[in-house]
């Protein structure tokens, strides 16, 4: 009896956590409720364990010391903790706390925008804008940009007035507070609109909120106060511009659309190559000579045989790229350029064939694209290429990457020795740090463990594959991480794999930025920067179907609005996916963008030229359309192109170099209808433009559907047994209408363009 009594007393006296380890305690904490108006986070307490705050997903509301900022509406925040017991540490799961606002009278409901406003205190009534809208802004450049966007949204005249002067909309920079670099405070009253922020970026994001509100209720906005800032500091999109070319005009539309949704990180893959070299090897061809590769920036680098590093089809001059980076900064978007080495580096190995990797490796048939990672000459070559853009350019007077801040060193999918890889990765990361840039790298160290140290302090890492890099390993090694998980966030357009674009609803309903593959980090972990979705153009070269940047616009923009909500907004989405998509439609495209090249009306264009060439100066027209011409080709010298219609968007060619009718797009891809115009005979020419298909009719009879020419000679040389040859051809063409007949040898009697 005494023995049983002793056991009972011991059980009652013992703490229930006495037998728990640090991890068990971390995931079973009891978090005290946060009272309204509390200024400090109440900490959980467990006997025998030390508990520290790790972080909060809204660090603007609960900082690293647990200080709580006031809120104007009830706001959920996730917090996590670090627990130490018996010399061992563990990180807790997320715990949601609710920060309560003082009770207020019911006012206007929260305006619906993308991403959702974090805090809103509704007022009564609305502010109405007159026929002329006045804006006062302390930043002249921002003021001009905002005014131009406002005119586009409202169709009204917008006038800039001096900072501090009476205006419909007054912008100001605030001192102190907890808004951070990207936060803003928007106050709408019956006497005007006031937008304040601690930094110009926050002001700019606030203008996007106002513009989205005005898109839905032109001329008025509801009274109330909004306080808004992002949940994650990095909200990104990666675009592979290497394996499929993209014109600068398209990238500017991407930037403006990112800004529309408050996305702020544009990662551009500058070099890459066709990765399925085995398709060449297995058919008796040499991929080193034949696989498609591109480096999209102007460079002075050349091989001993004169082979240029720069792509021959489409590239950006140093000035164009530097200007693009500066342009993006005006829209709150940081451009991160990537040079991918030592793998995916065919542009580099063609420059220096002697630096092809010689060690044992997996995927032997892909050796041609692998640089000799441990060779000092390889590291010297890659460093020199980076320096061409990271150091001051004599013509520009500044580095090409001056406004980038972050540069990406690539380093994914190297199939050689792990120590060689680690040596190379450490060298290129250290070089970027030495030049004053923050380097970013593809996570690969879980697949490449070893003794050679790889620098982590001040380094960002894309976590793209749990097989190559595990999230907790990356964090524990000291890297700042970005969720770029391939299974959730990768898109290879029109492929049978990596199709995040087919799962937008699932992404919207279920994806969380802190879940990376099968691992989950606390949402407020200080090393979790945010997330990025990626468009990879794997199906290039002999697998290219001819798809245009136009064809993937819906893929990009339709992913952006979803990721925006998930990365800026709270963990719980405010609407159903169907309601979200309705809102996307209501707010429309970003101001001053027309990515699908639609005309505002369906009125036809009719031209009867008296002579050629003739200026048309009409906007280019995207599908659907029908072009009808009556013309006569009077001469067709062999090998000489004849341009019928031209604009920055492309050229319609009456005669290509092979004599056929075709076109060249602004992405540099060329297409042929396979038919020739008769010489010395009047003919009726019709071009019918549809999404993914452009057709030719001559005198009312079908004369061909456009087919990609760029890689056609290669694909013909492969046997019909080559199962990867494209079975579908896409030939979207934006009809250029700036000039008619710039080099056409003949007469155009009549032209009609009809939007369909």
UniProtKB/Swiss-Prot annotation:
Gene3D superfamilies (alphabetical): Chitobiase/beta-hexosaminidase domain 2-like (3.30.379.10), Glycosidases (3.20.20.80)
Residue positions of the active site: 272, 344, 413
Keyword line: Carbohydrate metabolism, Glycosidase, Hydrolase, Polysaccharide degradation, Signal
Record has Zinc-finger as a keyword: no
Activity's thermal dependence: Highest enzymatic activity at temperatures between 30 and 40 degrees Celsius. Activity is decreased greatly above 45 or below 25 degrees Celsius.
E.C. numbers: 3.2.1.52
Residues binding substrate, per UniProt: 243, 412-413, 464, 490, 536-538
Bias kind Polar residues: ranges: 603-613
Reported pH dependence: Stable enzymatic activity between pH 7.0 and pH 9.0. Significant decrease in activity with pH lower than 7 and pH greater than 9.0.
Cystine crosslinks: none
Signal sequence segment: 1-19
GO BP field: polysaccharide catabolic process
Molecular function GO labels: beta-N-acetylhexosaminidase activity
UniProt note on regulation of activity: Inhibited by Mn(2+) and Ca(2+) ions. Maintains 17% and 60% of its enzymatic activity with Mn(2+) and Ca(2+), respectively. No significant change in activity by the addition of Na(+), K(+) and Mg(2+) ions.
Spans annotated as Disordered: 588-614
Reactions accelerated catalytically: Hydrolysis of terminal non-reducing N-acetyl-D-hexosamine residues in N-acetyl-beta-D-hexosaminides
Pfam families in the cross-refs: Glyco_hydro_20 (PF00728), Glyco_hydro_20b (PF02838)
Protein family (similarity comment): Belongs to the glycosyl hydrolase 20 family.
Cited function: Potentially capable of cleaving the specific glycoside linkages in the process of mucin degradation in human intestinal tract. Hydrolyzes synthetic substrate pNP-beta-GlcNAc with high activity and pNP-beta-GalNAc to a lot lesser extent. Does not hydrolyze pNP-alpha-GalNAc.
Protein name from the UniProt record: Beta-hexosaminidase Amuc_2136
